[in-house]
Amino acid sequence: MINRIVSFFILCLVLCIPLCVAYFHSGELMMRFVFFWPFFMSIMWIVGGVYFWVYRERRWPWGENAPAPQLKDNPSISIIIPCFNEEKNVEETIHAALAQRYENIEVIAVNDGSTDKTRAILDRMAAQIPHLRVIHLAQNQGKAIALKTGAAAAKSEYLVCIDGDALLDRDAAAYIVEPMLYNPRVGAVTGNPRIRTRSTLVGKIQVGEYSSIIGLIKRTQRIYGNVFTVSGVIAAFRRSALAEVGYWSDDMITEDIDISWKLQLNQWTIFYEPRALCWILMPETLKGLWKQRLRWAQGGAEVFLKNMTRLWRKENFRMWPLFFEYSLTTIWAFTCLVGFIIYAVQLAGVPLNIELTHIAATHTAGILLCTLCLLQFIVSLMIENRYEHNLTSSLFWIIWFPVIFWMLSLATTLVSFTRVMLMPKKQRARWVSPDRGILRG
């Protein structure tokens, strides 16, 4: 990984950019960027989502009466389920995986040193179910090692990897593998997670996130060439592609982001399959949500730092839009911080050579932002209602989530990017016990 001197320089750079803009031009220009960057990205996501829907997605068969997918040459599919302390969820997860309408599957559950009753539950199920194989690791090694173990044991070239608390839709495995059968350069396919936990405000807000933000982002990124990350909770991989890049890294806090960049930097492509539904549990407390998003943001910063030099090779030009998007979003977060600090110093009466009269959006900007949130909701509802019909019940929370999304992104980026740049180090990434929600919706 890039040494500490370089990473410290990067941190100084993202702080100096907004300061230089404010000092040499004006604080007002700096704050315009704070408003217009989320505005611009939201428009990009809306346009990209609509384009993906019109020219691809709307033609794909879907619905209760749709026939089961028929895959070319009837390949076998290995569903790998890494488990750590999943006694409350793993049985339901395995039954959903085995209930696929596509029959040529095997399920491999990897118990990563669980300390609860997960081992006993898996052994009992394996004795009763022929298509289920169970592997026990003596000690907790982390999700990346569990996935590697499952991949080594799998019989198929096509691996569908899900979490130990995720419920696959009846055709998810077939849908998510299909793009790899028709394009030999597709190394991975990411699915479409849907939220089960929605009994609290935090849970309902995340329904809005996955309905109005995440899906549009994935569709847009797929249109302009590359995807920032596969979904860690449901993704399919071509085993030969994984072998070429060395499988998952065990020293990265988010193995899903890391493997996505490793594949794409080796000229493999990643596809988004919205019909590969997977029902998941998510945090329903603010503390749980914060810890999860901080981990995601830290993982993105680690991958950014790890791959920064490789990105500039000419063969990786398709990754440049992701690089610039991540860089500008990070600069946006630190611009917000600098703006708040300058404004607070001015309020305290300290003389500065920088003029900043306000940090809140103007009346016109506020109207534009509200209009854009509403437009983003309408577009998302039109697209996602195909897969989840009760989204209107979360109408209020979905409309306002774009604002919450950017505020959460601001806070987690500031903390995680600073942490990674000041303390770049390699160590084994192991499981933590996440907030899985209070009640399951």
From Swiss-Prot:
The keyword Transferase applies. Pfam families: Glycos_transf_2. Keywords: Cell inner membrane, Cell membrane, Glycosyltransferase, Membrane, Transferase, Transmembrane, Transmembrane helix. Residues 26-32, 352-362, 416-441 are cytoplasmic. InterPro entries: Glyco_trans_2-like (IPR001173), Nucleotide-diphossugar_trans (IPR029044), PGA_PgaC/IcaA (IPR023853). Belongs to the glycosyltransferase 2 family. This is Poly-beta-1,6-N-acetyl-D-glucosamine synthase. The gene is pgaC.
